[in-house]
Amino acid sequence: MAQLLDSPGFIERSAAVPHKAAAAPATRDAAAPAAVPGAAVSFELVGKVFDGPRGPAAALREVTLDIARGGVFGVIGRSGAGKSTLLRLVNGLERPTSGAVRVNGVDVGTLDERGLVALRRRIGMVFQHFNLLSAKTVAQNIGLPLKIAGVPKAERARKVDALLDLVGLAAKRDAYPASLSGGQKQRVGIARALVHDPALLLCDEATSALDPETTQSILALLADINRRLGLTIMLITHEMEVIRAVCDTVAVVEQGEVVETGPVWRVFGDPRHGATRALLRTLAHDLPADLAARLRPLDGAAPLPCGAQLLLDVRYTGASGGEPDLGALTAALARNVGDAVHFVHGGLDRIQGRVQGRLVIAASLAARGAASPDRIAAALAAARRHANRVEVLGYV
């Protein structure tokens, strides 16, 4: 498909001029971050304030963010965090109160109505709700933006047929929305978003109204479109499973601020902000209630009682990039604290080619009797050579 915004001057070639009602851009401090060359979208110290019944309310605060061209960028946060506002700034549905939003280097806030129309024709948008016209067929729904743009009928038909093949709905060409499943309706919405050959696709909670199985099929379709067409995708969601399944990079938004950003594997494997850890809670391998109820803390220098099982929390963050050697890990523990070492809880996952996760390991002390603090410390030191983090939870 045609590349979006062929050069930084594409908007100007679409007859854009500075918006007459817009104030002149404020002079930025010399230390303010500049747009990253080659970035599809850049947010530079962006703030957005809405007038509420109780006075001004800040939806975004000094957001600085760069979205690389050709990737799938996820934005996640709780309800009301500012995610959708961030998205609406990209296609000019909202204007920033401060800062600048740049698409391929062009400041969206300086565009007049003609410039915004040119911009929006090159940015696809997929919504949470399908917004299909019930009285029109699948093909007619997809082709409507082309008809409005004055594209000839024969060309529209060719384009619609190609998009139907792309989203797997060729057999539903003449069907009406009432006969479609939720996933099929969203596929129509995705096809419609691609009619103007965009290279930037915005997805606002595109799977939140779908069941888990259908969600996975839509995410697989988005990933396929990203690979085949080279689209940059900016995806808004409140589900960490969606981020894990399809995104390359993620930004966590909390109360209008971007509190954490990075490759998905790093943010999932080593979350650094409380908001990120809270969002990941649904995917965390928390200690089961039966183990938590029996868990006892270590008592300083006192050895463990005979028959106790030492519980260790073993974490793989993906930072090493290699495959975990679980055999070496258990052997190191067995040499130091117990002959019987086994896994009691947890799991490992692979994200962007990196293995990460949490394992709770029990080392039985029955065969050796009491284990001294020195022996436990030696076991931890040995185990840490085979994992990113190893900590003692206590004993049962």
From Swiss-Prot:
Membrane-topology annotation of the record: Peripheral membrane protein
GO cellular component, one term: plasma membrane
Keyword Transcription part of the UniProt annotation: no
Cellular localization per UniProt: Cell inner membrane
Binding, ATP: 77-84
Gene coding for it: metN2
A family per Pfam: ABC_tran
Domain ABC transporter: residue ranges: 41-280
Species of the source: Burkholderia pseudomallei (strain 1710b)
Listed SMART domains: AAA (SM00382), NIL (SM00930)
Assembly and interaction partners: The complex is composed of two ATP-binding proteins (MetN), two transmembrane proteins (MetI) and a solute-binding protein (MetQ).
Catalytic activity: L-methionine(out) + ATP + H2O = L-methionine(in) + ADP + phosphate + H(+); D-methionine(out) + ATP + H2O = D-methionine(in) + ADP + phosphate + H(+)
Source organism superkingdom: Bacteria
Leading EC class: translocase
Name used for this protein in its record: Methionine import ATP-binding protein MetN 2
Taxonomic classification: Bacteria, Pseudomonadati, Pseudomonadota, Betaproteobacteria, Burkholderiales
Family according to the record: Belongs to the ABC transporter superfamily. Methionine importer (TC 3.A.1.24) family.
Keyword terms of this UniProt record: Amino-acid transport, ATP-binding, Cell inner membrane, Cell membrane, Membrane, Nucleotide-binding, Translocase, Transport
Enzyme Commission number, as recorded: 7.4.2.11
GO molecular function, one term: ATP hydrolysis activity
Nucleus listed as a keyword: no
Function: Part of the ABC transporter complex MetNIQ involved in methionine import. Responsible for energy coupling to the transport system.
